[in-house]
Amino acid sequence: MPLLQLLKLVRKSSHFFEPVAQSAGGAASATGWNEGKANVPTQSAATLGDSNPGMHLTIGILAALLQREHTGEGTFVYQSMQDAVLNLCRIKLRNQIMLDNLGALPHYAVYPNWKWGKVIPRAENTEGGQVIGWTYKAKGWENDPNAYVYIVVQNSNKSWEAIANTMGHPEWITDERFQDWQHRQLNKEDLYKCIESYTVNYDKYELTKTLGAAGIPVGPVLDWHEIENGPDLNKDGTIVTIDQGGNRGKFKTIGLPFSLSNYKRAPDLGENNKEILASLGYDPDQIEKLTEEGVISKAQGPKNPRTEVIKGE
């Protein structure tokens, strides 16, 4: 089937699920490893094709509302799941264009030994930009599959000097393999080994504290047990415990990823009856009479009241 016809078929399909959108949006083909059994298009754990389209659609709706406010005219807003995934993968299009023109991608993990073709390879664990990002073993990796840290080596020699000095290997600064950005890209495998010879001696939290204090971009690989029970995440409202009352009890979920300084909760059923009716011209006696006669109900919560949102037990 011709490519153009195939793309039209994909866009007209009404049977999209989240992984289908990841696949059609270019995410799966660019994710994973390039050799061995893991060399298959891989789904991201993030719901790139599900929540993401809804967020993009919200941005479109807000833009349309702003346009209406300025022009007085409404508009239709269209958002496909495929387009939303493509937008988050836009850096991969940049990489494809670079490959079209350069014939190779120096910032990819497989450089310089890869047999380059017409299509960008899978990114493995590289950072998306022109820096050298990689996942390194930390102390305890033999028994903990997530005992790792992610470290970014920025392009500047100053950044490399900070890494070399902090890790106790100033000789790396003058090592010909790492003398500048181009040489570090050409000798990534050796660079990975050097850095990991240091990281493997410390746990991921120690590494994050030590390297972070030196201005090195670093972060621990957190598993979901750590995230669920992280004291800071539970304290600041990133993870919230909601009390649904009744038989449902309490449960944890992810809170809003942003905060508003003047946030107010949604009102309970009937909570604003007096204010609304007063704004329509009803006086207090009339409102009270309507309430007594059952025309309107007294303010009440739902049958399984969410009595509070607890930001930590």
Language-model features, listed with the residues they occupy:
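Active-site-adjacent "lid/gating" segments in soluble enzymes
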Residues: M1-A147, A162
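Amphipathic terminal alpha-helices
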Residues: D285, K289-E313
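Conserved, function-defining micro-sites of small-solute handling proteins
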Residues: S197, L207-G215, P220, L256, ...
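Flexible, acidic loop-helix segments that line cofactor/substrate-binding pockets
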Residues: T75-V77, P106, W114, I173-Y198, ...
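Aromatic-enriched alpha-helical interface/lid elements that frame and gate functional surfaces
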Residues: I132-A214, V218
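A glycine-rich dinucleotide-binding beta-alpha-beta segment and adjacent secondary-structure elements
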Residues: A213-Y263, I310-E313
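Flexible, small-/acidic-enriched active-site or ligand-binding loops
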Residues: T42-Q43, Q244-T291
